[in-house]
Regions:
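Terminal amphipathic alpha-helical/low-complexity segments used for targeting or macromolecular assembly
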Residues: 1-102, 106-107, 143, 149-150, ...
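Structural signal for interior beta-strand "rungs" in well-ordered beta-sheet cores
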Residues: 44, 103-282
């Protein structure tokens, strides 16, 4: 998520009532989950195992629970609960984003009982079938078909375990569906935590498929019914994923790969490979 205005790091430290360490002249231009951070962003980390990954990322400012050596040109916001601080900042700044009513092209067909959220754009010659729910910050390009009762852009399944239970990460991202995508009935595509979940042009998705937050799917890919794709997965172009496949978070399926039905994919799949089984391996 990008801020409407850059925020000086000393203001952020004051807002969070936390210690500031490192470059005190920085301005934050946004706040993002670690998988999608850019220069100028705030990211968070709360486990020593991932400190270095966060410090080496593109993020300029890191929310972290303790002081550690800081790379040049970066800063730390030292807070005992980085997850809570991250959620607080998202909540504080998402309210400043401009929200507009859905914009629907005159040639699009919208069936009864469709819900359209704020900052939704539906382009020419789209068809949105009855009962579909298109949540905030969803961009749908031309020629897209969305089946009955599908939900596009609901919140990410992202929680922090605490002694009292689970706290949800606030989702403020969106979904971008490129031209000529077809999505079947009863599908769910989660929006990004702070970034964008993307479906590439010409991709076809069967009924009852789930796609997790921040996943990136390329062009002309086929996904058959009953698949469950976790968050932050990268799927290339011209991939074929047959029925009831499950995919672990953060893996990559490269171009022209084929995943046979009922496979459980836990590791990256090379370009052009054909995988089957649980855990899936080369055929």
């Amino acid at each position: 998520m990008k801020f409407t205005e850059a925020q000086h790091i000393t203001y952020l430290a004051s807002l969070l009532d936390c210690k500031l360490s490192g470059d005190t002249h920085l301005f934050a231009t946004g706040i993002n989950e670690i998988h999608v951070v850019e220069q100028g962003d705030i990211a968070y980390v709360d486990h020593p195992k991932y400190y270095q990954k966060a410090l080496d990322s593109a993020a300029s400012i890191i929310l972290i629970p303790e002081e550690v050596p800081i790379p040049a040109g970066k800063a730390l916001l030292i807070h005992p609960q980085p997850f809570d601080a991250f959620n607080f900042l998202v909540h504080s700044f998402v309210s400043q984003l401009k929200l507009e009513d859905a914009c629907v092209h005159e040639s699009a067909v919208i069936y009864p009982n469709v819900y359209l959220g704020k900052n939704v754009q539906i382009s020419e010659h789209c068809v949105i079938h009855a009962g579909a729910h298109i949540a905030d910050h969803t961009l749908i390009e031309s020629g897209v078909i969305i089946g009955p009762n599908s939900v596009i852009g609901f919140d990410a399944f992202y929680y922090k375990k605490k002694e009292s239970g689970y706290d949800r990460m606030i989702s403020c991202g969106g979904v971008h569906i490129s031209a000529n995508v077809e999505i079947g009935a009863l599908c769910t595509i989660d929006r990004g935590v702070t970034g964008i979940t993307r479906i590439g042009a010409g991709t076809k998705i069967d009924n009852q498929v789930h796609i997790g937050h921040d996943t990136q799917i390329g062009t002309n890919t086929l996904i058959a019914a009953g698949c469950g794709i976790s968050g932050c997965v990268k799927i290339g172009n011209n991939v074929k994923i047959w029925g009831q496949v499950g995919m672990a978070s953060g893996i990559e399926i490269r171009d022209n790969a084929i995943i046979l039905g009922q496979s459980g994919v836990t590791k990256n799949v090379p370009e052009g490979a054909e995988y089957f089984g649980t855990p899936a391996g080369p055929v």
